[in-house]
């Protein structure tokens, strides 16, 4: 027993209440479920990539602790592996050749990481290599594919696929398809495995490997690392075997920070939506508490009963909300982060942690319990037990003037607090966003009071019974109306702040890539989402293209991804004949013309702001850069943004790249057309020359811009998902809240009928009142959402190192407001009309 009440009695009381107020409890529960679904949905949208990638990396490296890795895609001499194995502290060493590739099958094409392995890698115990490369199915020539890749291209074992790599197209046989029962979630990763010798032939790199995984003898890790560094002689890197994960953490950090901030804002909005859904029941619960007190229950027992009922309702509704959030995350909002597949072994599987489900459940239950405690003031000893029942109208749900004033002051203070926190420390933007969301709720009561005054004045000139009724309801500032407006305000706030910041970031990225690609009319590349970092061999192609009709010039562009410390940086090597080298919109420090001039020479590089900050670099200062030919000295020609790649970029000349990277292989050919030649016609001319190079693709500048724009939007998919989830949740929550509000007011509508109002007057009053409530709520949410957008855009610029110029985006804001308000009016139209038909006898029954 608890406070002299058996648990069975608590269940009995709740069942009795549920029978008496079934519709109200269902509507409140649906609102809670929507809030929980939003919380879980945004948390799942923010699921880190590291969970799936860690399983993939561990499936390859097994028990290896160290790796000797090349600084370029060309790798290093395979004979070095024997010297590694001969080191005193080495227990096992396995060479690997990794190369970006594309597999084409009957159903489509997939970009993969082609991994060439030897049987010695099996001794390291990696799940992937044990189950793919160790079996007899790969003895000979062929590749092994995870089921995710095989299903995507539509092949099975012994089928033939087309493999594109190094600018060449080859037909290879699929020797094995391995599923999750053998390699777990790695089965969804974009990989292809073959024997090392065969991979070397496929990639045109005979006798080359890109890394050696090393398992030291017990206790010999540091000694072996030292020996490997001596063996590397400044031309190779020595790193932990799971260095891929460390690099991925660095690249994912800005995006994770941004999506985490917005996910938490979205989750908080979901929490408050849940809270507001419960607030809709406050008037009836206050009457229920008064009835309990009149029946002889003391304050502790009344509190226990209401708390228990809230706990049951919150738990059941949260379970439904979790199911809704799970379905949303696996249908409309399942992330496919293939934009990183060319740089990391990232799969499209979504890792769902039990902790996220428990967190969403806890949020739903906690919000329900907190909202159920709102009537607790009625339990104080100085207040009469039946005070609520004796209030005018019997509702006891109005917010008085003093409380309204306190809320208004609190709202203004929260806005000022958010501003001060963000100015003092940008890392406090998350707390500032939460403060603005709370301010949104606090300012609604005073907005209602102001609206009532304005509309009361308007009513003197506009004689409308509907307006009279609407103004009377607004003046009471009832809890259900405040909660209803709060639903719309919170959703609009979150959607405007998150969607606006995402739009700014995308606009900055689009401008960057447009300038980056402006140096050529037609680009010849290997295709794919690779930031133009895949080199290829195409002997004689440049000369053939230069002789083609309508072609003005052909230039070699080079570039790759290179590991520099904890960063996998984007190396951009521009020919001196390019029109512009530094994207103008991305320049932060230095002079554009001067920087371009320096980069056309030798020994200069433009560095991104993240790299410059990490190494305390300023324009003109020297720095050392590890290259495949050893450490080389460069000077800073300019400092740019991160130019669309989170770890940062280095821009230098192709002359320096050829010299220090020791390769002349292009990553792209930049083709400029004669004046007056249509880009589409020029592309057809280029494609006719590419007939002998089936693995290469020609794209006009506009087509390549569209590809990069699509990649940017995929990279920021989580922010779009969260913004969309907020609007969907708002629509569902508004529908639930409006239905609950109408249901609760049946007695009031019946009493108005007794006073002479007909159904059509009541219906118009409901529509007008709903329009005003949602309009003011959404307006407050939009205003503070725009301010949150300003703060978020500034924070994104500082966090990601990308350009994110602020844009108000009024049409986008109006669209969000119109969507939520429009849904509300559509939802209330039919139920409102049905409610307006209520019999006047209901007033006497209540």
What residues fall within each predicted segment?
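Peri-transmembrane interface segments
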Residues: 52-53, 230-268, 281-283, 292, ...
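Hydrophobic alpha-helical transmembrane segments of multi-pass inner-membrane transport and secretion
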Residues: 22-47, 253-290, 311-324, 363-370, ...
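Small-residue-rich transmembrane alpha-helices
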Residues: 275-278, 312-343, 355-381, 410-422, ...
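Alpha-helical transmembrane segments
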Residues: 25, 29, 36-63, 279, ...
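Hydrophobic, regular-secondary-structure patches
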Residues: 25-113, 136-137, 151, 159, ...
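Short beta-strand boundary microenvironments
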Residues: 112-152, 511, 531, 539-619, ...
């Amino acid at each position: 027993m608890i406070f002299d009440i058996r648990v069975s009695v608590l269940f009995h009381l709740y069942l009795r209440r549920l029978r008496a107020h079934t519709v109200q409890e269902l509507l409140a529960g649906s609102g809670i479920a929507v809030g929980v679904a939003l919380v879980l949905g945004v948390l799942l949208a923010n699921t880190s990539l590291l969970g799936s990638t860690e399983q993939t990396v561990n499936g390859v490296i097994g028990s290896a602790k160290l790796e000797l890795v090349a600084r370029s895609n060309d790798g290093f001499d395979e004979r070095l592996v024997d010297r590694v194995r001969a080191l005193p502290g080495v227990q096992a060493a396995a060479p690997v050749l990794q190369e970006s590739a594309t597999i084409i099958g009957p159903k489509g094409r997939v970009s993969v990481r082609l991994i060439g392995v030897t049987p010695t890698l099996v001794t390291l115990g990696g799940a992937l290599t044990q189950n793919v490369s160790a079996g007899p199915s790969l003895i000979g020539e062929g590749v092994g594919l995870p089921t995710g890749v095989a299903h995507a291209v539509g092949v099975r074992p012994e089928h033939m696929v087309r493999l594109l790599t190094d600018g060449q197209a080859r037909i290879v046989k699929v020797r094995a398809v391995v599923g999750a029962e053998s390699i777990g979630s790695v089965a969804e990763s974009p990989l292809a495995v073959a024997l090392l010798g065969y991979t070397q032939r496929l990639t045109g790199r005979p006798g080359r490997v890109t890394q050696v995984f090393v398992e030291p003898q017990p206790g010999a890790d540091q000694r072996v690392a030292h020996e490997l560094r001596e063996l590397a002689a400044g031309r190779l890197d020595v790193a932990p075997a799971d260095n891929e994960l460390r690099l991925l953490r660095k690249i994912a950090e800005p995006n994770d920070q941004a999506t985490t901030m917005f996910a938490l804002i979205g989750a908080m909005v979901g929490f408050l939506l849940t809270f507001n859904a419960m607030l809709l029941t406050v008037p009836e619960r206050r009457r229920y508490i008064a009835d309990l007190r009149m029946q002889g229950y003391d304050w502790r027992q009344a509190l226990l009963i209401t708390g228990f009922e809230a706990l049951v309702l919150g738990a059941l509704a949260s379970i439904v909300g979790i199911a809704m959030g799970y379905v949303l995350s696996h249908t409309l909002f399942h992330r496919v982060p293939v934009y990183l597949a060319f740089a990391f072994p990232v799969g499209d599987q979504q890792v769902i942690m039990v902790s996220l489900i428990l967190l969403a459940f806890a949020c739903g239950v906690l919000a329900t319990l907190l909202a159920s405690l709102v009537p607790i003031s009625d339990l104080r000893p100085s207040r009469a037990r039946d005070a609520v029942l004796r209030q005018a109208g019997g509702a006891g749900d109005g917010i008085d003037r003093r409380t309204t004033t306190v809320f208004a002051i609190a709202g203004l203070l929260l806005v000022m607090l958010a501003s001060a926190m963000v100015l003092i420390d940008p890392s406090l933007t998350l707390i500032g966003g939460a403060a603005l969301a709370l301010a949104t709720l606090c300012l609604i009561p005073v907005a209602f009071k102001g609206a009532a005054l304005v509309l009361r004045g308007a009513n003197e000139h506009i004689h409308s019974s509907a307006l009279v009724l609407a103004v009377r309801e607004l003046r009471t500032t009832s809890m259900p109306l405040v909660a209803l407006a709060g639903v719309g305000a919170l959703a609009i706030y979150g959607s405007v702040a998150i969607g606006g910041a995402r739009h700014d970031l995308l606009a900055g990225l689009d401008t960057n890539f447009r300038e980056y690609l402006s140096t050529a009319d037609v680009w010849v590349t290997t295709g794919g989402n690779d930031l133009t970092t895949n080199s290829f061999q195409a002997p004689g192609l440049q000369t053939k293209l230069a002789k083609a009709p309508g072609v003005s010039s052909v230039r070699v562009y080079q570039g790759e991804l290179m590991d520099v410390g904890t960063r996998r940086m984007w190396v951009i090597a521009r020919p001196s004949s390019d029109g512009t080298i530094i994207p103008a919109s991305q320049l932060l420090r230095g002079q554009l013309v001067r920087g371009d001039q320096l980069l056309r020479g030798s020994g200069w590089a433009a560095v991104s702001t993240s790299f410059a900050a990490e190494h305390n670099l300023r324009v003109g200062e020297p720095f050392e850069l590890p290259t495949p030919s050893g450490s080389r000295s460069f000077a800073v020609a300019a400092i740019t943004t991160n130019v669309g790649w989170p770890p940062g970029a280095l821009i230098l000349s192709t002359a320096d790249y050829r010299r220090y990277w020791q390769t002349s292989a292009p990553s792209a050919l930049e083709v400029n057309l004669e004046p007056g030649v249509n880009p589409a016609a020029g592309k057809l001319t280029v494609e006719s020359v590419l007939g002998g190079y089936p693995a290469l693709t020609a794209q006009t500048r506009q087509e390549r811009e569209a590809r990069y724009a699509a990649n940017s939007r995929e990279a920021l998919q989580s922010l779009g998902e969260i913004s969309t989830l907020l609007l969907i949740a708002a629509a569902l929550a508004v529908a639930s809240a409006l239905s609950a509000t109408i249901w609760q007011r049946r007695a009031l509508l019946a009493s108005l009928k007794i006073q002479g109002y007909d159904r059509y007057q009541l219906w118009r009053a409901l529509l007008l009142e709903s329009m005003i409530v949602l309009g003011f709520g959404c307006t407050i949410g939009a205003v503070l959402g725009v301010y949150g957008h300003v703060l978020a855009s500034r924070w994104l610029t500082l966090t990601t190192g990308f350009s994110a110029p602020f844009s108000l985006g009024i049409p986008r804001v109006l669209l969000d407001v119109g969507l939520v308000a429009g849904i509300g009016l559509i939802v209330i139209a039919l139920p409102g009309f049905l409610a307006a038909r209520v019999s006047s006898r209901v007033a006497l029954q209540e």
